[in-house]
Amino acid sequence: LFRSSAASDVYKRQANVLSHLEYYLQLVWPELNVNVVSSTEQWAGAAIAGPKSRDVLQKLFPDLDVSNEGLPFMGYMEGNLFGVNAKIFRISFSGELAYEVNVESDNGNFMWEKIIEIGKEFNIQPYGTEALSTLRIEMGHVAGSELDGRTIPYDNSLEGLVSKKKDFIGKRSLSKTAYIAPDRQRVVGVVPLDKKTSIPEGSYIVKDAKAKLPNPKL
């Protein structure tokens, strides 16, 4: 999860964490004086990734120090994108140097056009969420569609991160029957036999690919 602090008492969190925060505020810590609100539709975002991403970002924000020291990994700053206020995050979903730029949704098209215009010098190429998902998997991130409320650290070889002594959020869940049953569903990786075939997202695994419909999935 990524968090940036733009003020001492204001935090912005990305990814699908709103439902978790609402759950804990209602049932676990109802005494806390904290409000959460979704601002997703108020912002437009673009990821700039690759070995030349810092060069592109510097031309987009010439007045900012976006060097490794000025904007370290997981860093955050605000800037002016040709008259438009922008929020800049250094975060990578691809394993390469990458940034994410957010502007108010009304300025989304303007931001996109500027990124493409400035990026031409560096042979920039647009890529979509399908490509991003592939890059994210290659990076090693396990999130999104791979995880749900039934997934535990032991499913992903992350048992070394689970403390046996200290308390932590979710520790109680690890002792529930549903999470320790030997026949429980688990998240696993699927690799094609020829190592080349790309398995589309959302594909079904069936016992006999040539069987007539309906063909039950495994």
What are the roles of these predicted feature ranges?
Residues 9-218:
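Conserved, structured C-terminal
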Residues 1-7, 11:
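Single conserved hydrophobic/aromatic residue that forms the stacking wall/gate
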